[in-house]
């Protein structure tokens, strides 16, 4: 879990900004949003299948784009 120690002579805004950066880097907010509601395994598998298909199509597009330049 991210934590920030406030340095002497440091404003609240600067400390808050550092805290926000740490939470963004650790993906805390996105994980909390994902776990907010229960998802059955069928939904998780469906999302994984969709993302795998998107990833494959993107790679195929990039490969074809690269080959057309040769």
Curated annotation (Swiss-Prot):
Gene Ontology CC annotations of this record: ribonucleoprotein complex; ribosome
Keyword Manganese belongs to the record: no
UniProt entry keywords in alphabetical sequence: Ribonucleoprotein, Ribosomal protein
GO molecular function: structural constituent of ribosome
GO annotation terms (biological process): translation
Pfam families (UniProt xref): Ribosomal_S21 (PF01165)
Keyword Ribonucleoprotein part of the UniProt annotation: yes
Family, similarity comment: Belongs to the bacterial ribosomal protein bS21 family.
UniProt xrefs under HAMAP family: Ribosomal_bS21
Protein name stated in the entry: Small ribosomal subunit protein bS21
Organism: Campylobacter fetus subsp. fetus (strain 82-40)
């Amino acid at each position: 879990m991210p934590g920030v120690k406030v340095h002497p002579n440091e404003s609240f805004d600067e400390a808050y900004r550092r805290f926000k950066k740490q939470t963004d880097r650790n993906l805390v907010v996105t994980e909390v949003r994902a776990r907010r509601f229960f998802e059955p395994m069928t939904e998780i598998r469906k999302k994984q299948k969709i993302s795998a298909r998107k990833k494959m199509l993107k790679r195929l597009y990039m490969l074809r784009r690269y080959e057309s330049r040769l």
